[in-house]
């Protein structure tokens, strides 16, 4: 019994060594990469928001990482944003103070970020109001390609979509990015689907 276990362990170690020797993609999910993805997501929100003030992330979590090859990956994030005291032309919202009050605009957001060699290549995001006092449950802010600008509405909303339509668009966008960067068929087994939850280290 012990010999069988030792043999299994030895085969496992040899298999891991073989994968590493053949270039199995290993990506270092350091805090700077996650911060870069979050910053790009918040920047997308601010770039297409109709608010006169900048939004800033209050909390975030990494929901999924799709590794396409040794240099390219797609991150799916969830994060919350709140309006700050800085005007739109203030630049980086990371140093801005949050506005105070019961009716301060706050939204829950999701984003898909494609990164290559540590650099952000593409970002898609959408948000919904976190407070029912701000809008009803069907109202959302959509942040994506400028081709969607016809969906803009009053206040800070950029679209009205049902939950089903929102889910389909988010899923289609993530799949589109993965297909665009899909490696050749003989290397598809290298794709990883990892789930990780990150504490509010971006706060």
UniProtKB/Swiss-Prot annotation:
GO cellular component: extracellular region; protein-containing complex
BP term (GO), one: protein-containing complex assembly
Keywords on record: Disulfide bond, Phosphoprotein, Secreted, Signal
Chief localization: secreted
Location relative to the cell: Secreted
Disulfide bonds: 86-96, 109-127
Post-translational modification: Phosphorylation sites are present in the extracellular medium.
Highest taxon in the source lineage: Eukaryota
Electron transport as UniProt keyword: no
Modified residues annotated as Phosphoserine in this record: 90, 137-138, 162, 165, 174
Signal peptide range: 1-23
Family matches, as Pfam families: Spp-24 (PF07448)
Keyword Cell wall biogenesis/degradation: no
UniProt cross-references to InterPro entries, sorted A to Z: Cystatin_sf, Spp-24
SUPFAM superfamilies given in the database record: Cystatin/monellin
Function in brief: Could coordinate an aspect of bone turnover.
Family the entry assigns: Belongs to the SPP2 family.
Protein's name in the database: Secreted phosphoprotein 24
Species name: Mus musculus (Mouse)
Encoding gene, per UniProt annotation: Spp2
